[in-house]
Amino acid sequence: MLFRSYFTAMSDKVYPAFAGVLGGQKPVLKVRSMTSCWGVCCPAKRQITFALQLYNQPPAAQIYVVVHEYCHFLQLNHSPAFWAEVEKLLPDWKARRELLKK
C-alpha cells in the first residue's frame, strides 16, 4: 500500500497534462514486482502498472517512467509521434532514461 501511495502521488504530478485525453478520469494504478520493464500501460483498461523496483530509482527516472506510461494513452507504440509526446513534457527524457540503465 505504501508503494502505491508513493506512485499515486507521483502520478498526480503528471496527470493534469493528460486529464483531457482521459476524460477527467484518472487511470487505475497498480504496483507489482516486474523483471523486464519499469512500467506497463493498458489504455483499454485505463490502467498503469509500475514495477516495485522503480521505487529504488532516482526521482528523475521515476518521473520519466510515469510520463512514458501516460504517453501511451496518446500513442500505443514507440513511434516518433510517441517520443515527441514524451519530449513535450520532458525535454531531457533521454538523460532520465539513462538513469534507469545504471
What residues fall within each predicted segment?
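Active-site-proximal or metal-binding-adjacent scaffold patches in catalytic folds
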Residues: M1-Y64, F73-K102
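Walker B catalytic acidic pair
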Residues: E69
